[in-house]
């Protein structure tokens, strides 16, 4: 109940639907941070600049054809997907291989969404989130490096090399951990054709319309 109440509060204050469920978790986490701090550091941008989405980039590295439907299965959630938008975004990107094109996609499009999500969630709490990985000097330096240098033998390899003397090996090489939200439990969904992400999108639209008298 706290999750849904918080989500409604955020939609009301922002006057727009939320993008993904973990926006609510970021907001709640920031509320706790606000007890002692008004400025935080965030790691947004590291996965986009240093290719940290292992599952997607591994697929892109082994395919010769950037099939939008297949990419969509790795990238998007829910059953009601509009691949025309995704196809349009990918079409004009530079890059000769699927791997290169997706590298640009995540930096140009995906990262913008993450930064907006972070900014919206933290500013609602009057907390400033700083993102050192998207400092323009670092972005410009990475832009001039080769795709081989960024990927190497594993993903985010440059970061691992840089920090290997500072951060313990078990942290550097641990399995990637997501930030999931148990939507099935939150919405108490029965077994049906409706996915939890479909229900989340419908919840957003219903509350957005209610707050804006649509």
Model-derived regions, located:
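A conserved beta-strand->alpha-helix junction
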Residues: 1-13, 80-89
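Short low-complexity, flexible loop/linker segments enriched in glycine and/or proline
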Residues: 7-12, 56-58, 186-188
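Short, glycine-/Ser/Thr-/acidic-enriched flexible segments
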Residues: 46-47, 139
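ATP-dependent adenylation/nucleotidyltransferase module used to activate substrates
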Residues: 1-9, 18-43, 111, 163
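Adenosyl-5′-phosphate
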Residues: 39-41, 66-214
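Short catalytic/ligand-binding loop motif for oxyanion handling, primarily in non-cytosolic enzymes
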Residues: 2-6, 48-52, 57, 180
């Amino acid at each position: 109940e706290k999750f849904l109440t918080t989500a409604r509060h955020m939609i009301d204050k922002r006057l727009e639907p939320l993008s993904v469920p973990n926006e609510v978790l970021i907001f709640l986490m920031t509320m706790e941070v606000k007890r002692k701090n008004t400025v935080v550091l965030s790691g947004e941008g590291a996965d986009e600049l240093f290719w940290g989405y292992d599952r997607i980039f591994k697929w892109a590295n082994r395919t010769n054809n950037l099939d939008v439907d297949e990419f969509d299965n790795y990238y998007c959630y829910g059953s009601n997907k509009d691949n025309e938008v995704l196809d349009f975004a990918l079409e004009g990107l530079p890059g000769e291989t699927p791997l290169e094109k997706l590298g640009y996609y995540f930096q140009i499009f995906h990262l913008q969404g993450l930064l907006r999500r972070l900014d919206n969630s933290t500013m609602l709490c009057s907390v400033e989130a700083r993102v050192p990985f998207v400092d323009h000097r670092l972005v410009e330096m990475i832009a001039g490096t080769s795709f081989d240098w960024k990927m190497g033998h594993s993903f985010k390899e440059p970061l691992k090399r840089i920090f290997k003397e500072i951060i313990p090996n078990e942290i550097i090489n641990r399995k990637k951990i997501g930030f999931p939200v148990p939507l099935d439990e939150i919405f108490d969904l029965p077994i049906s054709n409706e996915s939890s992400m479909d229900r989340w999108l419908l919840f957003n639209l219903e509350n957005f319309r209610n707050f804006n008298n649509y």
